[in-house]
Amino acid sequence: MTIESYIDYTNLKPDATPNDIIQLCKEAKQYRFASVCVNSSYVPLARRELAGSYVRIVSVVGFPLGAVASSIKAAETTFAIANGADEIDMVINVGQVKARNWDYVADDISGVVKARSEERRVGKEC
């Protein structure tokens, strides 16, 4: 395996345009990167651009701060998976970690895992 096959090629800029994501996908295929990582709103576009390729689609949820409600993260996960995401990268609520509110953190993660599981996909939990 080459180093390229380990790269998650990412564009999470808040001002990323559809053309930026199309270019990201084109380059990911060209250089044989493992995956592209995009905001959930761009998962459907990435899926169309990467159709028939081996490049996986990673979607972030709760990005960038992790401070949204757990139910929002679960809904974002459901949307991303339903629209073609192969993997979910979740941002946990750092404030709750700092407060050592482990029950909240566990419930936050569990909500995303459950939403992902309901869509019958396997991803990684962060």
Residue ranges and their predicted role:
Residues S59-A99:
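Glycine/small-residue-rich loop that forms an oxyanion/phosphate-binding "nest" at active or ligand-binding sites
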Residues A34-C37, E87-D89:
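Conserved beta-strand positions in the central sheet of alpha/beta enzyme cores
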